[in-house]
UniProtKB/Swiss-Prot annotation:
Plays a role in the maturation of immature virions to infectious particles. May also participate in viral transcription. Belongs to the orthopoxvirus OPG146 family. The keyword Phosphoprotein applies. This is Protein OPG146. Keywords: Host cytoplasm, Host nucleus, Phosphoprotein, Virion. One of its GO terms (cellular component) is host cell nucleus. Pfam families: DUF678 (PF05077).
Length: 76
């Protein structure tokens, strides 16, 4: 039996593209708006004028305005 005969009358489905993570592009994202954050290795290549620091280790995401903390800061 030919595969074209077995599918007659059936609609063909589009395959979903596979998401692959490229190591160079593998950086953390904001948990609220999913915008990409600066990697520590890129810190010398990027202008830091857009980073809003709050108090201590807390940063503010410029895309959505949410405050970003380290996980160990929640325990204290």
């Amino acid at each position: 039996m030919d595969s074209t005969n077995a599918r007659s009358g059936m609609k063909s489905r589009k395959k979903k593209p596979k998401t692959t993570v490229i190591d160079e592009d593998d950086c953390m994202t904001c948990s609220v708006c999913q915008s990409k954050l600066v990697k520590i290795s890129d810190i010398t290549k990027v202008s830091l004028d857009y980073i809003n620091t709050m108090r201590g280790n807390t940063l503010a995401c410029t895309a959505c305005g949410s405050s970003l903390k380290l996980l160990n800061d929640f325990a204290s």
